[in-house]
């Protein structure tokens, strides 16, 4: 018994000694800022549906590695697998990116020949280049697929970024550079952390990357909608929510828990895209609005790739897929050409990703409340942005302030087989349809703030009518900020062509210094070779006439109209980079708001017998294409008839149409005996009333 007792005492003594020794080790470890957190979640997080746990690591504010317990490993692994499987496709939908980077690496600046710690644009380049390398590392057909050296460079790049970031983050100012230059730190940088961590999830670097992501996104993206003291909404928050959600998964939260967070709920309310009648979001006619009153598709395009992540995270039902599809159809094309009036403030007609978003039908699309008409045919894309007092006609910022004419007056078609020729500093002021008030085309509307400012028209009325293959838009506009420029604009899209008439063009009297105005019919970027002769050479070869002048698959013609003074076509080069076909309008007629111009554009290789007439009065313009399509512009009404279908709309947005308007219209197009049957309206008093005017404002009738 005594021997047994002695053994027991010795064992107890050893246990006590080991316990005390272990406690001292822990205390020493705590002095070195290391800790073990076996339950990093708050108490209510223990209800997670996935309870599998795995040990991993995290960091403290000195970037030293510490232990972490992952409570939702299956959900984490599933998402990371899905992310890698879809990375290349997702990247193809991402507008801001560096594709197939090949920059040399640098242990101080991440990449050679950049100054990312003083230049925010260079920091953005570093971020986008790192993401581009992640795509290469993950692409099985790339020569850098799972390259060990690249893996090291990626984690090292992440380390370098972390070593430069202020801890704690600055409040309402960027870590370096201009105070308000926050974008890359809030939007792009978190995506870098997510991309690097996930593509390295089968390497020795994963634990370190995950711990860095948990720590630094906890500082710079503490919620899905907050960063560096700012609260972000709309397109910005959509981008923020994707890496934020991943960082929360890394912290052990389940997707069900993350969904309940206030910031995530804000984003889900945004991406649900309920139809709205004002403010940010998807308007009832499926036009995307941002900055309260701006058709700002740049934000939607930049965020579009995130929608797949949200449907993975939280289910298919979180996105208004039907509305979003229509929103893209309303403005886009498979080639990526987009009407500039809904695009970026710097003036662009092209998105490198929008063509990948959906399958585009050949159709005519109209947004009756937001005033956009678009036609996509086999041969061309065309679109016009009208005006309404509810929405801005232009938004400027301290850098971009000369694009208002482009946004409001672009009237052209793009041959789908032609080259995509985007604007540059020399060409952005010169586009078909723009009414020039000076020879250099510059019309500045500066922002009155340190950020963006939007401008609404003094007069903003638009009517749209469409059939199966034709669409017409009638615009009555006046812009105080553009020298009180006013006009009525009549545009008709039809097979292989477009008709354009401006009348009642006017400006503030005595404001042009006795310089004639001009309407641009066709513009040529002389720096791009399309195998077309110069406009001047074409004119000389055509007996000193610019009829039929061609550029990049589009042909222009003057359209005469009875009893309207339509100027001849002339050629001019405002600078060495641009050549124009124009119609000159006298400053005297502009002072009295009686100037006019009229032309048509056709797809090269196609012609038509289009004719236009003024019927009875200045406000009644009849256009006959000659292939069953007729249009009538009789302010405030516009009508399009195609074979057995006819549609009407009023620029006053009337929900009733008098019988007299219909009968007078049929008389004006030479078909007074037409019999018709309503398709979306019913007899109401002395006319018809729309069945439902919630989403559109066109009256549609079948000819019987």
Swiss-Prot record:
Keywords: Host cytoplasm, Host nucleus, Lyase, Membrane, Signal, Viral envelope protein, Virion. Pfam families: Baculo_E66, Lyase_8_N. Residues 1-23 form the signal peptide. The active site is at residues 236, 291, 299. GO terms for cellular component: host cell cytoplasm; host cell nucleus; membrane; viral envelope; virion membrane. Changing residue 345 to A: Complete loss of non-sulfated chondroitin degrading activity. One of its GO terms (molecular function) is lyase activity. The keyword Isomerase does not apply. The record marks 395 as: Important for catalytic activity. It is found in: Virion membrane; Host nucleus; Host cytoplasm. The keyword Amino-acid biosynthesis does not apply. Its EC number is 4.2.2.-. The record marks 345 as: Transition state stabilizer. InterPro entries: Baculo_ODV-E66_core (IPR043082), Chondroitin_lyas (IPR008929), Lyase_8_alpha_N (IPR012970), ODV-E66_C_baculovirus (IPR006934). Component of the polyhedra envelope. Plays an essential role in oral infectivity. May digest, with its chondroitin lyase activity, the chondroitin sulfate barrier of the peritrophic matrix of the host midgut to facilitate viral infection in the epithelial cells. Belongs to the baculoviridae E66 family. This is Non-sulfated chondroitin lyase E66. It comes from Autographa californica nuclear polyhedrosis virus.
């Amino acid at each position: 018994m005594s021997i047994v007792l002695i053994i027991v005492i010795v064992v107890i003594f050893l246990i006590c000694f080991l316990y005390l020794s272990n406690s001292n080790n822990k205390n020493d470890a705590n002095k070195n800022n290391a800790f073990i957190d076996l339950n990093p979640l708050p108490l209510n997080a223990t209800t997670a549906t996935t309870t599998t746990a795995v040990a991993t690591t995290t960091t403290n504010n000195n970037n030293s590695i510490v232990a972490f317990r992952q409570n939702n490993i299956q959900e984490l692994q599933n998402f990371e697998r899905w992310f890698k499987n879809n990375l290349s496709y997702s990247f193809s939908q991402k507008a801001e990116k560096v594709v197939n980077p090949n920059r040399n690496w640098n242990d101080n600046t991440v990449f050679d020949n950049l100054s990312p710690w003083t230049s925010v644009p260079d920091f953005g380049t570093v971020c986008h280049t790192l993401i581009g390398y992640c795509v290469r590392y993950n692409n099985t057909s790339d020569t850098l697929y799972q390259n060990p050296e690249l893996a090291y460079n990626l984690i090292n790049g992440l380390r370098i970024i972390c070593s430069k970031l202020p801890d704690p983050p600055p409040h309402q100012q960027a870590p370096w550079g201009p105070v308000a230059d926050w974008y890359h730190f809030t939007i792009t940088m978190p995506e870098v952390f997510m991309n690097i961590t996930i593509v390295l999830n089968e390497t020795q670097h994963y634990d370190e990357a995950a711990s860095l992501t948990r720590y630094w996104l906890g500082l710079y993206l503490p919620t899905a909608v907050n960063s560096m003291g700012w609260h972000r909404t709309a397109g910005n928050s959509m981008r923020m929510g994707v890496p934020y959600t991943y960082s929360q998964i890394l912290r052990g939260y389940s997707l069900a828990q993350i969904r309940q967070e206030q910031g995530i709920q804000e984003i889900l309310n945004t991406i649900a895209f309920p139809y709205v009648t004002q403010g940010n979001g998807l308007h009832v006619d499926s036009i995307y609005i941002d900055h309260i009153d701006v058709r700002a598709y740049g934000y939607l395009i930049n965020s579009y790739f995130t929608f797949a992540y949200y449907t993975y995270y939280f289910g298919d039902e979180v996105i208004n897929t039907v509305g979003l599809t229509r929103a893209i159809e309303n403005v886009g094309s498979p080639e990526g050409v987009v009407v500039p009036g809904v695009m970026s403030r710097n003036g662009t007609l092209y998105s490198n990703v929008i063509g990948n978003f959906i399958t585009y039908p050949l159709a005519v699309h109209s947004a009756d409340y937001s005033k956009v008409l678009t036609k996509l045919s086999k041969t061309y894309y065309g679109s016009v942005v009208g005006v309404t007092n509810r929405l801005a006609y232009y938004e400027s910022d301290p850098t971009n302030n000369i694009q208002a004419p482009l946004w409001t007056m672009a009237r052209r078609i793009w041959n789908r087989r032609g080259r995509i020729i985007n604007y540059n500093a020399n060409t952005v002021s010169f586009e078909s349809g723009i009414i020039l008030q000076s020879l250099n085309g510059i019309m500045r509307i500066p922002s009155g703030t340190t950020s963006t400012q939007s401008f609404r028209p003094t007069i903003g009325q638009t009517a749209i009518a469409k059939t199966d293959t034709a669409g017409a838009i009638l615009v009555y506009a006046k812009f105080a900020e553009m020298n009180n420029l006013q006009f009525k604009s009549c545009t008709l899209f039809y097979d292989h062509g477009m008709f354009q008439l401006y009348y009642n063009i006017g400006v503030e009297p005595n404001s042009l210094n006795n310089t004639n105005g001009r309407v641009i019919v066709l513009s040529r970027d002389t720096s791009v070779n399309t195998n077309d002769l110069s406009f001047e050479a074409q004119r000389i070869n055509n007996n000193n006439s610019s009829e039929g002048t061609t550029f990049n698959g589009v042909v222009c013609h003057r359209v005469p109209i009875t009893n309207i003074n339509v100027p001849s076509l002339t050629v001019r080069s405002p600078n060495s980079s641009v050549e124009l076909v124009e119609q000159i309008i006298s400053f005297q007629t502009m002072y009295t708001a009686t100037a006019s111009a009229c032309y048509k554009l056709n797809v090269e290789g196609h012609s038509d017998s289009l004719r236009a007439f003024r019927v009875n009065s200045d406000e009644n313009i009849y256009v006959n294409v000659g292939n069953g399509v007729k249009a009538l512009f009789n302010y405030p009404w516009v009508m399009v008839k195609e074979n057995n279908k006819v549609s009407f709309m009023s620029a006053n947005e009337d929900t009733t149409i008098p019988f007299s308007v219909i009968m007078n219209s049929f008389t004006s197009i030479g078909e007074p005996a037409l019999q018709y049957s309503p398709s979306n309206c019913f007899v109401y008093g002395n006319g018809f009333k729309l069945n439902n005017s919630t989403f559109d404002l066109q009256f549609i009738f079948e000819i019987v």
